[in-house]
């Protein structure tokens, strides 16, 4: 009971401070802070699932966040037809080659598990694949990046509503977490933390330097919104009437009609910004509430009790027949997928994707401070 009261008091103080910002500065700034808090809360839920449920330390939050942001770009931006004509098919061929290399290596590991030549065969496949990839991708990338580099210079995306990117971002981050988990989850806690941090830096480096995919440090701007634009709201009669009705008292104090119209116009501009951020806050609140309900249900389910048992004593859980490695991998993927959702939410809110802005202090260690 005492803990519940402390939690309620903490959230009440935070909400009070946000309201105070609204009164003393502006409601637009207060709602911006609220939206960023909600996005950070989603990231924290993802990290807390890994640490609180399974005792896994993941310092790669920045990388999963960036993948979520990349998903927003690849889903919402329209395809650049000229870039696809210049080298899109070649890049698809490169993706097919990579997929084929993975299948061949997996087949070699299965068929030549006891052969002394297994490693030589795998090395030959990798070297041959990399040479082939280089020969095909280099001219294709050069051609793609030469297509109107000031505004495009990349393949673009699918042109779908950006809300779909929240799901795609979860799959991107979860897929990377699956690969990392297969390799690194057997490491000791401190080595796992270092490995995940380094892999996240690699992800950021790839996104920053592969212009054909994400425009790199040239950034992607003007992403689609799931809410109305301010300029559109300012021309809507229903919105103008709503603002006029809400501020009727202050407008009635102005006797001059010209001044009243100018005051109303300024109020409409300010209110449009507040309305848009209220819409974003509503969307983000729904996501946070759904995640909190699902995670709480999972925590007190038989599966949640099993995860806590594994966290407290892996040896005992393993002796009771629980697959510790499998459950660790599952929780690692789930937590990372939630962080990927948060990354897509952030790019959706900002309306732009800036790979150069991803820093460990903001997107990893600050989130861990919130978890702790």
Task: Annotate each predicted stretch with a short phrase.
Residues 1-372:
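Transmembrane alpha-helices and adjacent helix-loop boundaries
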